[in-house]
């Protein structure tokens, strides 16, 4: 193994030298004290958790999970085709179809798998399909399109003019699909969804939208930005996750019966893996149902988002201005981004994970702040003042959100 160890060590050392080495934080989350956690025997406040609404610890969700555990056991027992098609997952798929006003849904083990295997399978099902993909689409989308080996065009981030130019270059009668996200997880920008829908109609293309960072958070029932804009019925495939606002695990797609059935019969990421256990699918169903009926969590969430952005404006903290709940603070240097994150955690008891390349482009390294309804005014002030002190110590310039927004957005779409 010594020869291969040398190769592995060289690879690791290169990543370390670039300030990109990732270390796991050993955390003990506290279900009864969200958003606190325990880290190295001290209590910390979590500001980067994707459990957007704290639904993982909601009493309805936890009780549903406990009941399912006692009724069905821990595991699912197999793949969906062989012993693992528990009634709980069928109920979940009905709930998801209703959420997005679609005929049916298909659940996967993760959002990554849902994107990857669905997109790759569409190329098997639809001969000569051409993909049109936003340049900042998630790695799971990129992986699915790449493994499809289909013809593809990548359009500039959020640039519908460039997208149309690319669509014009392909025969109108050739099958096409436009793949995009409703909200981009690293910059928080929303896609021009209605403009993309109009282009899809004009150029005879299917639409595939990734709503993982918006389901549960936007829309009357939590159906995401497409529900908020009342255009769910104009999008062919809506993909989402159960692992963020809904507080569980898993991914899904929703569409019409024929498309979903074709994916069900084709996608290896669905066919050849054990299904979600009933304890998870039952919890997810109850989480979705609660957020369909309750708007309280969404309202409180938006209030905290607004308060945090206002605080950052007040302290001149350089966040990337957007309309969403995702609040990136651009550092622009991997070493400094790591230092800021470590100082927040070790000196102030605040956990914000730094985001470096390859997750974001080089030169746009950042912290990504994720507010929840449980974050208090004191927590907001503590985070803001800690950042000001750390920026001063590390000689990181404070600048207004408006100024930075122009500079960084040009960098992102160049």
Curated annotation (Swiss-Prot):
| Listed transmembrane segments | none
Q: Which cofactor does it need?
A: pyridoxal 5'-phosphate
Give the GO terms filed under biological process for this record. Answer: protoporphyrinogen IX biosynthetic process
Sorted alphabetically, which Gene3D superfamilies does this protein's record hold? Aspartate Aminotransferase, domain 1 (3.90.1150.10), Type I PLP-dependent aspartate aminotransferase-like (Major domain) (3.40.640.10)
Q: Name one GO molecular function term.
A: 5-aminolevulinate synthase activity
Q: Which residues carry this modification: N6-(pyridoxal phosphate)lysine?
A: 244
Q: What class of enzyme is it?
A: transferase
The family database entries (CDD domains) matched by this protein are listed as: KBL_like
Q: Fetch the NCBIfam families from UniProt.
A: 5aminolev_synth
| Name this polypeptide is given | 5-aminolevulinate synthase
Q: Which organism is it from?
A: Rickettsia prowazekii (strain Madrid E)
């Amino acid at each position: 193994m010594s020869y291969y160890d040398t190769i592995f060590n060289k690879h690791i050392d290169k990543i370390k030298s670039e300030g990109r080495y990732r270390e796991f934080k050993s955390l003990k989350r506290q279900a009864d004290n969200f958003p606190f956690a325990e880290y190295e025997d001290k209590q910390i406040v979590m500001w980067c958790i994707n459990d957007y609404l704290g639904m993982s610890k909601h009493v309805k969700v936890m009780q549903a999970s406990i009941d399912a555990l006692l009724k069905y056991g821990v595991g699912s027992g197999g793949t969906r085709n062989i012993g693992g098609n528990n009634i709980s997952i069928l109920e979940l798929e009905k709930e998801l179809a209703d959420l997005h006003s679609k005929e049916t849904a298909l659940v996967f083990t993760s959002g990554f798998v849902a994107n990857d295997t669905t997109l790759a399978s569409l190329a098997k099902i639809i001969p000569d399909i051409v993909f049109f993909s936003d340049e900042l689409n998630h790695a799971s989308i990129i992986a699915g399109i790449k493994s499809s080996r289909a013809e593809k065009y990548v359009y500039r981030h959020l640039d519908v003019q460039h997208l149309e130019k690319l669509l014009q270059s392909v025969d109108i009668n050739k099958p096409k699909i436009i793949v995009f996200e409703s909200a981009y997880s690293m910059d928080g920008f929303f896609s021009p969804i209605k403009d993309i829908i109009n282009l899809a109609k004009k150029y005879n293309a299917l639409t595939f939208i990734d709503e993982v960072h918006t389901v549960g958070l936007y829309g009357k029932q939590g159906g995401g930005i497409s529900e908020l804009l009342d255009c769910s019925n104009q999008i062919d495939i809506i993909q989402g996750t159960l692992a963020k606002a809904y507080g569980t695990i898993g991914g899904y797609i929703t569409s019409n019966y024929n498309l979903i059935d074709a994916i069900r019969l084709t996608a290896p990421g669905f066919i050849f893996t054990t299904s979600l256990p009933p304890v998870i699918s039952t919890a997810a169903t109850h989480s979705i149902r609660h957020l369909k009926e309750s708007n309280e969590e969404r309202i409180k969430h938006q209030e905290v988002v607004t308060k945090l952005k206002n605080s950052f404006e007040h302290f001149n903290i350089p966040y990337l201005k957007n309309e969403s709940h995702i609040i990136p603070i651009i550092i622009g240097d991997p070493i400094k981004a790591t230092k800021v994150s470590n100082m927040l955690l070790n000196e102030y008891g605040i956990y914000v994970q730094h985001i470096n390349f390859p997750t974001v482009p080089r030169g746009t390294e950042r912290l990504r702040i994720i507010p929840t309804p449980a974050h208090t005014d004191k927590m907001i002030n503590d985070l803001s003042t800690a950042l000001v002190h750390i920026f001063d110590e590390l000689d990181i310039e404070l600048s207004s959100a408006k100024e930075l927004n122009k500079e960084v957005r040009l960098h992102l779409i160049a």
